């Protein structure tokens, strides 16, 4: 392979130092103990209702959640929390945190994102504390998961674009994991769904980086209703 034939490596990737990469991979790994395995974001009801019953329908459901639902909204909140933390603008950070918490569509989804946000902050501070992080956390009543990731990432100097891609990959992987247990799907089919969603994750991240808080909105009514109906689902494996 000649130099001209080699895949292009962006400056952002080459400039990411090894400690930052190590932390990013650790924080957004399935092994990082935020309890994501216990939540399905309403997918359990979607399977119960027959909206999701195979790899293709799971891919379609998650694609819409990424582009028009909580995936995009949470991505924007992450970016703005990261930006406020970088600037040391605690008032702005508090506003973003409050808006993000208010935007959650159901009680169980509120539990899901606040519990994971709290766990993420506590564990990251215990193992990798950073100047200014304690003060930022103390000024916010509660941080939902994407806001917590944005704040911690900014405190450690990790670029928002890389942090955002890693976050969306982690969230999407967790959704697929829930779907694979519920439908069920095999490991190969699950990875095919993840591969098919790669361009969707990338496009969502690109949109979110340049989006304002006024651009936030959701059109995933079926997914929001699923998260509400899950609260009274008779038999269930997940907490949301």
From Swiss-Prot:
Subcellular location as annotated: Cytoplasm
Subunit structure: UreD, UreF and UreG form a complex that acts as a GTP-hydrolysis-dependent molecular chaperone, activating the urease apoprotein by helping to assemble the nickel containing metallocenter of UreC. The UreE protein probably delivers the nickel.
Entry-linked InterPro entries: UreF, UreF_sf
Source superkingdom: Bacteria
Sorted UniProt keywords: Chaperone, Cytoplasm, Nickel insertion
Keyword presence, Heme: no
Key word Manganese present: no
Role: Required for maturation of urease via the functional incorporation of the urease nickel metallocenter.
PANTHER family: UREASE ACCESSORY PROTEIN F
Single GO cellular component term: cytoplasm
Protein name: Urease accessory protein UreF
A GO MF term: nickel cation binding
Family, similarity comment: Belongs to the UreF family.
Species in which this protein is naturally found: Bradyrhizobium sp. (strain BTAi1 / ATCC BAA-1182)
